[in-house]
């Protein structure tokens, strides 16, 4: 395994030295591949284009992110930014690599969450676009464009994770394969508009299941905070370590989103706009308004105490689906109805 990890450092070193001029591009790509962006941008954008696809993106994101957390606890993968120091291989001749503000994630490294979660969650978008293109284009090359864009983007995300020393190549490959398989398996099986208890029990199962696994491993003598200690030890700047990269931050996001999805689907606002046919202008207005609400909503997720952060993060991602699915479309629909001119009979 050490030889595999050493080869990964060589690849990261080559990327940083040969493609240093693309640094801002790699940082932007790793931002676009962040699982948080799936919840905060890809989900509303997909939802306002297609209700079914948007719900699929949110559901697959929260389930896959939870699975990624469990996989990481069992696989104990190192991250390059600390392994290059901990291994001792480079004490005589230090590797010519450096960290970035997004390098210092605190969870274990295998498999890559960016690749696995994003790969799975973007699968329904890719298949929906492929179906649309297939009905309108005769050229075979045009028909494969959505699949090609999907693969190209995920490959770029994987390379960006290697570039910033967040993952080794084999962790990226594992994430890409696992994400594509999960996306393929889950897309046809996404629950649509189930009873509220289903979503509440899903959120409860995510929290209780994680707690059971955590305390079982802890009882067996496994220290699941080992990666947090290494991240604090070897990160070049303390301000680069963000609390939302901790494992339980993703759990609060996933369980909150599951509960919020159920509340949104059973809200009076959603019932009013469920069968309304919003025009393209109204859909764009919904997306712009939802993105505008991100600022005050994001403020909820950053209290100084770690326990309060988890609580507020849960509430934030519970509220977000309610805004996207119900409150924002309802507000736009009602405003548009008031602005529409009255119809006079002849």
From Swiss-Prot:
GO terms for biological process: gluconeogenesis; glucose 6-phosphate metabolic process; glucose-6-phosphate transport. Pfam families: PAP2 (PF01569). Changing residue 161 to Q: In SCN4; complete loss of activity. It is found in: Endoplasmic reticulum membrane. Its main location: endoplasmic reticulum. Changing residue 116 to I: In SCN4; complete loss of activity. Its EC number is 3.1.3.9. This is Glucose-6-phosphatase 3. It comes from Homo sapiens (Human).
